[in-house]
Regions:
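First exposed extracellular module after export/assembly in secreted or surface-exposed proteins
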Residues: 1-187
């Protein structure tokens, strides 16, 4: 048995999975869950649901990028149109141009650039780079998507910082820096 943890902290139990019977559940995988709430209440769950559709969200770790890996990680243009933190994840809504060819895969990463000069770093923030490798795909169609990056491997650094400062090589404005402050719990 499994259940879904929703972003606001509640739990959803999938009582009826008829529509998604072949969905492979992976612990820690973020997804959009389309469901219909069932009337019967289940103890320990805020929602009891019939699952209509599950759409996985690209879910990755933050990568420490040594200088020799910069080429394979890529630095092609991409827009970060929205950033927000949910639980242990940084979510980035993005846009990039592509050919609409399913055989042409792009790669997205959020990296700690070990070769950074520190020139644009903000000392009170964890400095990261949102990287895109288009693998020379033709730039014909503007596409959008969502990626979630686990914050667990920078959790210790974040304790001493105000938030994140993220470098993005944008589609239209060149290099941009976006900051997101992290709300600290007062103990």
């Amino acid at each position: 048995d499994y259940y879904f943890s929703l972003d606001e902290g509640s739990k959803l139990y999938p009582s009826d999975t008829t529509y998604v019977h072949d969905y492979a559940v992976i612990d820690g995988q973020r997804a959009f869950i389309y469901f219909r709430e069932l009337e019967e209440k289940l103890p320990g769950y805020e929602y009891n649901a019939q699952i209509k559709h599950i759409e996985n969200i690209l879910t990755k770790d933050i990568y420490s990028m040594p200088a020799e890996k910069a080429d394979s990680i890529g630095d092609d243009n991409i827009n970060a149109t929205d950033l927000w933190i949910t639980g242990e994840y940084l979510n980035i809504k993005y846009q990039f141009y592509h050919s609409n060819n399913e055989d042409k895969k792009h790669m997205l990463n959020l990296v700690i650039n070990e070769a950074s000069t520190g020139e644009n770093d903000k000392p009170d923030y964890v400095n990261l780079e949102f990287r895109h490798n288009a693998y020379n795909d033709s730039q014909l169609t503007l596409g959008t998507g969502l990626a979630s990056f686990k914050l667990d491997n920078i959790a210790e650094q974040l304790k001493e910082k105000k938030g994140l400062n993220i470098r993005v090589k944008s589609l239209y404005d060149g290099e941009r820096f976006m900051t997101i402050d992290i709300k600290k719990e007062n103990n």
